Amino acid sequence: VNWDEENNVKRPGMNYLSSMQAIALGSNSVLYFQWRKSRGSSEKFHGAVVGHDASEKNRVFQEVAWIGKDLEKLSSQILSTCNRAKVAIIMDWENWWALSDAQAISRKFDYTEELLKYYRVFWEKGIEVDIISMDRELLDYQLVVAPTLYLHKKEYIHKVEAYVEAGGIYVTTYWSGVVNETDLCFIGERPHERLLGLSVDEID
């Protein structure tokens, strides 16, 4: 890379080992950035398969060719491993911006840390998770977790209601459903009160 202090070349065979390890762990491909070194600009010395020598004889090119030949042999024996996550965590940029602007919560609050609390639980148990926005379809998932979803877009709650009615499990947390998509507080009933079967009487 062009941004690190030291860039050690991989030892002979290490590229092959890490590539086959990725395949063994479920990857469907081995990809490289970049294929050819540029002649100028900031990435002209960035690692690449084809170097400035434009040769097929150097070690990097030879190892990549070796990997390609072996992957071709394996291609008929390895099944596609494109798993589809059954769990989704909602991380929404507009929600993050609105939370960052809200002057009613502690400055110690960190939206990304809040999301990671939930993600870590699934990760430690080996459960795959998709990170999605409020705009995505929910019906593809068995469980949707929406931590601190302060901002609710106009049609979002209808989507959640349809998801729950279809048998989906929806988990949300504190400080959710407070403002609409223009960052204005909801007046009267909050959008998820009927869905969750609760109401907020007081905030401390």
Regions found by a protein language model. Give the residues of each.
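Carbohydrate-binding surfaces of carbohydrate-active enzymes
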Residues: 1-204
